[in-house]
Regions:
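Structural signature of the two symmetry-related core transmembrane helices
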Residues: 72-87, 272-287
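Residue-level signature of mid-helix packing/kink "hotspots" within the transmembrane helices
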Residues: 51-59, 142-143, 250-258, 343-344
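Helix-loop boundary and gating motifs at the non-cytosolic
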Residues: 2-51, 206-246
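Symmetry-related core transmembrane helices of the 12-TM Major Facilitator Superfamily/SLC fold
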Residues: 162-180, 363-379
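Cytoplasmic helix-loop-helix junction between adjacent transmembrane helices
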Residues: 102-138
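Helix-to-loop junctions at the C-terminal end of transmembrane segments
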Residues: 57-69, 153, 256-269, 354
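Juxtamembrane intracellular "pre-TM" segments in multi-pass secondary transporters
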Residues: 1-4, 182-213
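Hydrophobic core of transmembrane alpha-helices in multi-pass small-molecule transporters
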Residues: 15, 95-111, 215, 296-310
């Protein structure tokens, strides 16, 4: 049996999972507030639970990937997604909608970790290239999904049932791809190594540092997809123009991944991507207190995207180098769960800072937090990378 799947099928899977995921984020707040007549606070709590269950799905999926058939686990996740979304096709009132959304959160976290773990198993391609292209596929799925979800929602007369029907059909078709192309061998451990391989201390410290860095980065980054919409529209920018910022983000990521793949063939220091990315992410927030017009917000988004495209896919690639083949899934699950936790906590954290102080202090806090993450990562890498064992 083959030890890795064809790369194109892995990218297709990642793309489709993120198309499905992108149907949830843009509409949940509007649907819960306007159609289910709940408060914005309740909408925020529902999204918090959705991201929180992502953490559970990511962690559990990663642990199981190393022990059981990855194909069956992925197929099980797709079947569960079809069932939960199928319920929402016919019954999407309160409280069915938030309950099903929390269950879908588990499945989406599970499927994201499955794809990252499949990528971590690949030996025919460079790890940096694999994770850069996975990130590219993720974002392409998000851009495609968010582009079509608005018109579909309007066409369905503000009913989410048809949207979930589209997702059910898409996932059902994807299950056929998984059945045919996602079969890889389960790595059998020697009987005396049934327990998890003990990593060198330097490896463990670097993995936890990278995971913590991803949590903080996503906490700060998620301000853009949550609290920043209110801030930007409050400066006289329309919702259409705000949405255009995300189109710019998606197109830039597509272009940047091609440039990064070219750089990867000429540069052999992955850590530099993390340092550069953290610096750009921090700088993007430092621009915001001085932003007076739409052009400044576009500039900040461009700088943010430079940081995002270099730092965020680098972290799972670095972790992949630091863990053995038989534990790839577990550690990718940990990294994904930290990222999901950051996405869950970010909007709440930002809201509390804004409520207590204002937007300006939030921007400075985000700048300092991300630059601090870059500094701590640099110190830990300098301390441990020579003693670390690379797999």
């Amino acid at each position: 049996m083959q030890t890795e799947i064809k790369f194109r099928w892995l990218l297709l899977g990642s793309f489709l999972v993120n198309v499905g995921n992108s149907f949830i984020w843009p509409l949940t707040t509007v649907y819960i507030h306007d159609q289910l007549h709940q408060s914005l606070t309740v909408s925020g709590i529902v999204l918090l639970f959705y991201s929180g269950t992502n953490v559970i799905g990511s962690y559990v999926g990663g642990r199981l990937f190393d022990k059981y058939s990855p194909q069956r686990l992925t197929l099980g996740g797709i079947v569960a997604a079809v069932i939960f979304m199928g319920v929402l096709v016919f019954k999407n009132d309160w409280p069915t909608y938030p309950i099903m959304l929390a269950l879908i959160g588990i499945v989406n976290g599970w499927l994201m970790t499955m794809h990252n773990s499949y990528g971590a198993r690949m030996r025919s391609r460079d790890g940096r290239f694999v994770f850069n292209m996975l990130y590219f596929a993720n974002n392409l799925g998000m851009v495609f999904g968010t582009t079509i979800v608005g018109p579909l929602y309007q066409y369905a007369h503000d009913n989410v049932g048809p949207l979930f029907l589209v997702t059910v059909v898409m996932y059902a078709a994807f299950s056929l791809v998984v059945i045919k192309f996602y079969q890889i061998a389960v790595i059998k451990r020697p009987q005396h190594e049934e327990k998890m391989v003990k990593l060198p201390r330097a490896n463990s410290q670097l993995i936890w540092t990278m995971s913590g860095a991803l949590l903080v980065i996503w906490m700060m980054y998620s301000q853009w997809s949550s609290n920043m919409s209110v801030y930007i529209t409050g400066h006289g920018v329309s919702m259409t123009s705000y949405s255009l910022l995300w189109t710019i983000n998606g197109l830039l990521i597509v272009a940047l991944q091609m440039a990064i793949n070219w750089l990867n063939r000429r540069m052999n220091n992955d850590h530099l991507y993390l340092y550069f990315g953290a610096a750009m992410l921090g700088l993007s927030f430092l621009i915001l207190p001085f932003a007076k017009g739409y052009g400044a917000f576009v500039f900040s988004m461009v700088v943010l995207t430079l940081g995002e495209a270099t730092a965020i896919p680098t972290i799972p690639a670095l972790v992949n180098q630091l863990c053995p083949m038989e534990d790839k899934g577990r550690y990718q699950g940990i990294v994904n769960s930290f990222g999901s936790a950051g996405k869950a906590l970010g909007p709440l954290f930002g809201g509390l800072v804004i409520e207590r102080f204002s937007y300006q202090p939030l921007f400075y806090v985000c700048t300092l937090a991300i630059l601090g993450v870059g500094l701590v990562s640099w110190l830990m890498i300098e301390k441990n990378h020579r003693q670390a064992e690379y797999y």
